[in-house]
Amino acid sequence: MRNWSEKMRLEGWLLDVRFREDQAMLWIKVGDQRVQMKDRFNMDFFVSPDNVTQEKLVYLFDEHDHIVKIDKSLRFLSIDSPEKSQVLRVSVDSITHYRNLVKLVSRYGEVFDTSLSPSQRYLADRSLIPLGKLVVDVNDQNIITGIESLPLGLEVEPPPFKVLCFDLSLENEMLDLVTYNEYMQEEYRFTGPEYETLLAFVEYLSEYDPDMLACMETDLKRLISLQTKHDLPLSGYFHRKSFHLDEGRVYLNLMSYRRMSLAGMVERIQYNREVPRIASDWAAGRAIESRQTYEARRKGYLLPRNGFYQPVMSLEELLRERDHGGLIFAPNVGLHENVAALDFESMFPQIILKHNISYENVRNGRETEGFLLDFTRDTLDRRLYFKHKRKELEGDPEKWFWCETRQQALKEILFCTYGYSGCWANKFGNMDTFMEINKAARINLVKAMNIARRKGFQTIYGNSDSLFLERKGATRTDFDVLSDEIYTKTELPITVENHFRFLVLLPQKSGKNFGAINRYYGVTYDNKLVCRGIELRRRNTCQFVAKTQEESIRAMLDQESRDDVLSKGIEDANKVIDRACREIKRGLVPIDALESKTILRRKPSKYKARLPHVAAAEALNINGLDVGKGNVIGYVYVDADHKNPFRRISPAGYQKNFDAKKYMRLVEEAGRSIMLPFLKKEEEARKTASLESFFNP
């Protein structure tokens, strides 16, 4: 820790906030150093007495050893309160005594703001943004005398944080540590006997001096355990569900880092308004809840218990006003030519902003701006900026990648904002809000369909916020003009997302003629393959099956006309499937191309069914490898029909052979998935051919 010899004003990046008694310990990156600074901070909560007067409550606890102060405060009792009310604010001397005091005081009334984490309470009260830039005034003892958050900029580059991304495996006292760069490409590998390898990695860690460690939680716990075992300097410790790393370093969840990269992780954590050691692995719902909590605290709203604000709908209301969900226009199953997919740009957050829809104003009028709008607008503006900025950066792959990961990180949040509005876990949410957003979405989608119909376009598929339209002879310009007109009349941005040369809308897997939702594939006029809901899109599909399906789709659709697709195209696709099956049967496919990968969502022992990846994880545990929640489990089928689930598969890297029949079935199923609209015609053709051969031998 560096001590400054005089009072100084410093600018840096906020890495973490930790607590010791009545002090917040801030770790800030200043230049190329991580500096620890102290700020006096007392935990607090609010109470509204219900069986004693406020004066009586103050009298009862005024002399309590661990209460610093009880004072009167004006707060909004809920987000729909028109005026502030007087409540009592209880300040506690130490984080250690906080929970016991909350429990004690709650006997005398309703307590509020108790669900906030200490770090988020501090961030909200100081209006700070984690991983954001700030200015601090400090004295010669590194005690903060003033602090201010700087506004978030629109820089494409991520902040100058050094990240060490690694994974760890240990088997028979042989340690393997691999580090990766931002693109998850291997950089260094430390392999060998446990102690020597660990020592080399610890020395590398000290020399590289990263600001952040990106790894699986189990790997970091194992690293700290090995450091303890061999009496080496510790990287930190795990306490109260988060890592407190040495020298102010920050933990990042590896799965989130792989998916979003540093730029996306920064964007997501800045939205969460919670420090990364706690929030780096949060799903969108948890992130939204955190941001709402932060904003409510900062704006003076009392924070209710989980689900406290949820109004209960009567049976009559439920039957009369039941939600019909988003509008789905059933797919017109089969092959289509010259189709444009028009997509409303962030439709649901746009509706929230346009119609001023928020939890508290759905039933009570919308004269003032709702609670949801401020931070939803900020998030949407940032997402659209980075989304559109990508087009300017297509010649710069690195900056394009940063833009893409930033906008994707925010897209997940915005997509879930409307769904989370009716979730039971949402402190402020209610079904009315969710239903109102859905209603507006349905109205606007129907309006867009009618505009298209009047212009001669036919809707062949519609799903909540997108329309698939075709019109014989229509050009890309025609579709662009249509989207502009829809934008003008609905006041919701809409663009041509894809212009398909050929598009196949798939039926349900039962083989019936009912169209399946979000199951299609097609090729655009610029030869881009777009697909949804098929094996190629699934993360647990092995590389060989996915590659075969992609090749067969391209073979089918790489034709001059619709008639060619229905004849030569289908024939060429079947040839690709047949060739792949022959390669499997002859043992020509590398085993690593048949490896499936699935993420463990919980400990293997917590699964009720012994699914293939669960059986593989348990087998690894039996063999001395510690795998758990969050680990990516690779496996290969070796005897898929065996009664014993442990004999059906083998963990990746442990098998010599594979079940050829199983993989041939998987390839055939992948082929059948894309051929479903054409199978009936093929069967009729085969019947006709067999009859002709019978009568004309």
Question: Residues of each region from the PLM?
Answer:
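Metal-dependent phosphoesterase core characteristic of DEDDh/y 3'-5' exonuclease domains
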Residues: E182, P210-W282, I413
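DNA-dependent DNA polymerase catalytic subunits
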Residues: N3-K7, F19-V30, V275-H355, R406, ...
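A residue-level signal for conserved active-site and pocket-lining positions in enzyme catalytic cores
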Residues: D167, N253, R383, L414, ...
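Helical catalytic core of nucleic-acid polymerases
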Residues: V333-K447, R453-K455, E470
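A structural signal for short, well-ordered beta-strand segments and their strand-loop junctions
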Residues: R89, C165, M212-E217, V250-N253, ...
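DnaQ-like (DEDDh/DEDDy) 3′-5′ exonuclease domain used for proofreading
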Residues: R2-D209, T228-S235, M265, Q270-G325, ...
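Short beta-strand-to-loop capping motifs
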Residues: V90-S94, E217, F468-G473
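A general structural signal for short secondary-structure junctions and capping/turn motifs
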Residues: D80, L154-V156, Y204-S206, K241-V250, ...
